[in-house]
Amino acid sequence: MTEPSQKNNSTQQELTNHLFPEKSSQIGQKQLQQIERQLKCLAFQNPGPQVADFNPETRQQKKKARMSKMNEYFSVKYKVMKKYDKSGRLICNDVDLCDCLEKNCLGCFYPCPKCNSNKCGPECRCNRRWVYDAIVTESGEVINTLPFSVPD
């Protein structure tokens, strides 16, 4: 039942388009105007003063200034100085101190997987940024302390 009514509607529309071409052109113009309006709404209309005054050179200069400020802040205040050099010796006094903190120890740990030294504890001493201050048991008893002061 719907099929004959659809055929009827389509033939009626063709007849209207044929007899009244200006009506079909009006519909086409309305659709065109509607599409133009939608496109206009989608267009970016007001970019603002930031985009209008955009200059890549000044932007790059400002970025460099901000980056140098940030690098200065992080490198000076928060840079942790190395305590050991690349061979695992203390930088402050060039002593090859074992991580057990005994001055005369020849190495009491298993060979380090990175540098093959017997003086490295659980972590390799090469370029390390910290030192053991003391060897303390779980009960809090101090077994050994750092035999000399190491500056920060």
From Swiss-Prot:
Chain positions covered by the region annotation Disordered: 1-27
Bias type Polar residues, positions: 1-16
Record-linked PANTHER family: ADP RIBOSYLATION FACTOR LIKE GTPASE 14 EFFECTOR PROTEIN LIKE, ARL14 EFFECTOR PROTEIN
Taxonomic source organism: Mus musculus
Protein's UniProt name: ARL14 effector protein-like
One Pfam family recorded for the sequence: ARF7EP_C
